[in-house]
Amino acid sequence: MIQTITDLSALRALVTGWKREGLRVALVPTMGNLHAGHYSLVMLARQYADRVVSSVFVNPTQFGPNEDFARYPRTPEADMRGLEDAGCDALWLPDVDTMYPLGTALATPIHAPGVSDVLEGVCRPGHFDGVCTVVARLFNQVQPDVAAFGKKDYQQLAVIRQMVADLAFPIEILGGSIVREADGLAMSSRNQYLSADDRPISAQIRKVLLQMRDSHAAGVPRLQVEAAATQALEAVGFRVDYTALRLPDLSEPDDGASNPAAGPRVALIAARIGSTRLIDNLEF
C-alpha cells in the first residue's frame, strides 16, 4: 500500500527509517497528471533502489507568465493508483508553502549556466531556473540516493546532471527512455490538449526526427538538416520554436557539415500545433 505524505517531518522520518535499515532510496519527481512514461521511471528507479518516493508538485516557478500553470491538469487520485501499481512506496505531496516557505518571490534561485541558456532556455526564459530550484529542494527534502528523470525532456536532464555535479549532490541521476504512443508521439501530460484534428498531425514530429537522423547519416550539412526539418513541420501546420542537431552536451557541432563518424548526436524539436506545445528528441 502506497503511503501518501503531506508533512515534511513525516517524510524525513520515513526516509531516515529506511536508511537506518540500509535501504537505498530513489526519487521520481513529477508534476502529476501521470502516464505510462512516468510509471516507467518508477519501475526504472526500482531497479536501483529498495524504496521509491514519487513527488507530485505543480511548480509555479517553472511556468512563464503566458504559460499553462492554472490549467495544468491535476489528477491526484488517478496518479496515486498508477504509482501504487508501478511499485512506488511513498507519494510526497508538498504544498506551495512547504516547498517555498519564504514565498516564491524570496526563493533562492539556482541557475545552471550554459546548458540552461540555449533552445528551451531561449524559448522559455527562467524555466530551467525554476526546475533547478524545485528539484534541489526535493533533493534536500527526500535525500535520495538515486533520482530518475525522463529523456523526453532531454535538456532538462542535462541541466539536472550539471546542477548535481556542480553542487556535489550525492545522487545518481538516471535517464529513462521515452515512452511513445503507437503512432510515435512521445507521451506527455500536455497531449490531452490536442484537438481531434491536431492529434494525428502531432505524430509527424517523430517522423521528422527520423528524417533528421537519416539526413545526418547521409552527410547533409547540419544547417540544411535543421532547415529541412523546420520546413517539413511547417508544411503540416506546426509553428516551430526550433529544430536542432546537437552534440550530446547540447553544444553545436563545430563542423559545418554532418559527419556520422564524428560521434553521437541528438536531434531536438519544439513546435506548436493548435494551442499545444510539444517537444521531442532522438539520440543517435
Swiss-Prot record:
It catalyses: (R)-pantoate + beta-alanine + ATP = (R)-pantothenate + AMP + diphosphate + H(+). InterPro entries: Pantoate_ligase (IPR003721), Pantoate_ligase_C (IPR042176), Rossmann-like_a/b/a_fold (IPR014729). Its EC number is 6.3.2.1. It holds the Pfam family Pantoate_ligase. Its main location: cytoplasm. Gene3D superfamilies: HUPs, Pantoate-beta-alanine ligase, C-terminal domain. Beta-alanine binds at Q62. It is found in: Cytoplasm. It comes from the Bacteria. The keyword ATP-binding applies. Belongs to the pantothenate synthetase family. This is Pantothenate synthetase.
